[in-house]
């Protein structure tokens, strides 16, 4: 990820309204590196890994959507990010699954 984009995203926690935050990141497809995307609603594995790493470095804890909604109704400490992979494509689990697992992150499929 470019230094400029990392710098820009570093303002996210500071510019959001005070209080707990639940960010939701949604992807339709996950592409292997070098694979030509069929449409722009997908993400490459390396990009997904950078998203996970950057949001983790910014202090977001990865949760499922259900966990994030329960957290909003409960204690609400810190910041949470819910990754959602919709449409049930095999690449969601086959490619995103290992990237999430390596980081101990959870997501909604």
Question: Across the structure, where does each feature detected by a protein language model lie?
Answer:
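Catalytic alpha-helical scaffold of carbohydrate-active enzymes acting on polysaccharides/glycoconjugates
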Residues: 1-109
């Amino acid at each position: 990820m470019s230094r400029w984009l990392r710098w820009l995203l570093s303002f996210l926690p500071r510019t959001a309204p005070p209080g707990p935050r639940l960010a939701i990141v949604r992807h339709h497809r996950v592409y292997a590196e070098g694979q030509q995307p069929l449409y722009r609603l997908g993400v490459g594995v390396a990009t997904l890994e950078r998203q996970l790493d950057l949001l983790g470095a910014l202090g977001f804890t990865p949760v499922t959507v259900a966990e994030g909604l329960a957290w909003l109704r409960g204690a609400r400490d810190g910041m949470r990010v819910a990754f959602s992979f919709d449409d049930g494509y095999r690449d969601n689990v086959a490619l995103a699954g290992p990237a999430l697992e390596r980081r101990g992150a959870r997501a909604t499929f």
